[in-house]
């Protein structure tokens, strides 16, 4: 009797998002989950600290249980098997993508499925223009927009604080492919090994997987981007847990979102014109971006998702500033500033996001200074 096929999925970036995904893949599928580390030293550190186990505490479940699973195999550039990679999940920080991928590029080819699960925007351009420049040998590219709230506490434990699902879609390598027919989703659901794994009924239900066209995912990505543009830098600047600022965050969220939307409407014009162009065409999904991505609605939604559902969460950017790590501000609020410049818009149209980015960067610099020179407030 032939043994059932077992998919192998490599995960590059075993931080908060990589961990929550890996644990649930181990819980609900039979996939071989292989974390990839950037060096032999980091691999040895993981094995020494965790004993080849990955764990997460589910704060939203009664009793806040910890789920811990052993990983059968871990690799780094020095120990890598040198075999082609079938499925690769990238959950590194956006600014780390190019460097993290570099050692594994020889094993990524046109048959590889690569999914990005990251905050921010702008990585697709990086992949197209600087990494996968040969259009004939590019991998099958997917994006995951994750809304789960996960953070690492001071004891090193990852905490899954809020359950909110993940959207996945095939990414287009060219702008001409931005608008996809429903048949693209149907074909991947039937024939693509990564999509089939992520949409296995048990895992898909528990992780909240929603497989869609690119335009639907981009809609969700812009929605999530607006959440991140508010929650990440503001919690980092204020040094607060999400729910603490619920009563007072409205005015600053309004300023950030209103400015972002003005720029995004220009940069992603086909998406914002989608409803009037494709509504009623059965080959395309129904979607009205302009009914959702309004300033008033998004301030309400960001507050609901960020400060209510994930009230106990500490944002990834706040965690980075607390642990003195580089922050992703250039791919979030900084991305809006860069878009405005690329589109030759008035520099004043992005002054709020520019200031927010500068304050978040200043918060990180202040925390780093205090770690060396002490906290002057205590003198």
UniProtKB/Swiss-Prot annotation:
Substrate binds at residues 119, 228, 232, 316. The keyword ATP-binding does not apply. It catalyses: (R)-pantoate + NADP(+) = 2-dehydropantoate + NADPH + H(+). InterPro entries: 6-PGluconate_DH-like_C_sf (IPR008927), 6PGD_dom2 (IPR013328), ApbA (IPR003710), Ketopantoate_reductase (IPR050838), KPA_reductase (IPR013752), KPR_N (IPR013332), NAD(P)-bd_dom_sf (IPR036291). The active site is at 224 (proton donor). Gene3D superfamilies: N-(1-d-carboxylethyl)-l-norvaline Dehydrogenase, domain 2, NAD(P)-binding Rossmann-like Domain. One of its GO terms (biological process) is pantothenate biosynthetic process. GO terms for molecular function: 2-dehydropantoate 2-reductase activity; NADP binding. Coiled coil: none annotated. It holds the Pfam family ApbA_C. GO terms for cellular component: cytoplasm; mitochondrion. Its EC number is 1.1.1.169. Pathway: Cofactor biosynthesis; (R)-pantothenate biosynthesis; (R)-pantoate from 3-methyl-2-oxobutanoate: step 2/2. NADP(+) binds at residues 13-18, 119, 328. It comes from the Eukaryota. Present with 2600 molecules/cell in log phase SD medium. Belongs to the ketopantoate reductase family. Catalyzes the NADPH-dependent reduction of ketopantoate into pantoic acid. This is 2-dehydropantoate 2-reductase. It comes from Saccharomyces cerevisiae (strain ATCC 204508 / S288c) (Baker's yeast). The lineage of its organism: Eukaryota, Fungi, Dikarya, Ascomycota, Saccharomycotina. The gene is PAN5.
């Amino acid at each position: 009797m032939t043994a059932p096929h077992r998919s192998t999925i490599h995960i590059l970036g075993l931080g908060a998002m990589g961990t929550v995904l890996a644990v649930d893949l181990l819980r609900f599928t039979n996939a071989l989950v292989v974390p990839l580390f950037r060096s032999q030293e980091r691999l040895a550190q993981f094995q020494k600290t965790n004993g080849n186990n990955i764990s997460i505490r589910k704060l939203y479940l009664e009793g806040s249980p910890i789920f811990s699973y052993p990983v059968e195999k871990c690799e780094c550039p020095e120990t890598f098997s040198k075999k082609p990679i079938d499925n690769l999940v990238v959950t590194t920080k956006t600014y780390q993508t190019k460097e993290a991928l570099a050692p594994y590029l020889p094993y990524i080819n046109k048959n590889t499925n690569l999914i990005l699960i990251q905050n921010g925007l702008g990585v697709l351009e990086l992949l197209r223009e600087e990494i996968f420049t040969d259009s004939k040998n590019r991998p099958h590219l997917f994006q995951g927009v994750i809304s789960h709230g996960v953070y690492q506490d001071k004891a090193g434990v990852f905490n899954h604080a809020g359950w909110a699902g993940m959207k996945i879609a095939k990414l287009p390598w060219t702008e001409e492919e931005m608008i996809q027919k429903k048949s693209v989703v149907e074909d991947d659901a039937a024939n693509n090994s990564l999509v089939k794994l992520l949409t296995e009924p048990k895992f898909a239900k528990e992780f909240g997987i929603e497989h869609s066209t690119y335009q639907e995912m981009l809609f969700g990505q812009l929605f999530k981007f607006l959440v991140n543009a508010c929650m990440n830098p503001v919690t980092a600047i204020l040094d607060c847990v999400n729910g603490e600022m619920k009563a007072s965050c409205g005015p600053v969220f309004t300023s950030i979102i209103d400015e972002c939307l003005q720029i995004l409407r220009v940069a992603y014009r086909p998406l914002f014109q989608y409803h009037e162009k494709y509504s009623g065409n059965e080959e395309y999904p129904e979607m009205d971006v302009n009914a959702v991505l309004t300033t008033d609605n998004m301030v309400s939604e960001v507050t609901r998702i960020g400060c209510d559902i994930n009230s106990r969460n500490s944002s990834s950017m706040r965690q980075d500033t607390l642990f003195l790590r580089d922050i992703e501000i250039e791919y979030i609020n900084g991305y809006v500033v860069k878009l405005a410049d690329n589109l030759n818009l008035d520099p004043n149209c992005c002054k709020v996001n520019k200031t927010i980015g500068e304050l978040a960067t200043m918060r990180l610099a202040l925390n780093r200074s205090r770690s060396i020179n002490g906290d002057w407030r205590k003198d």
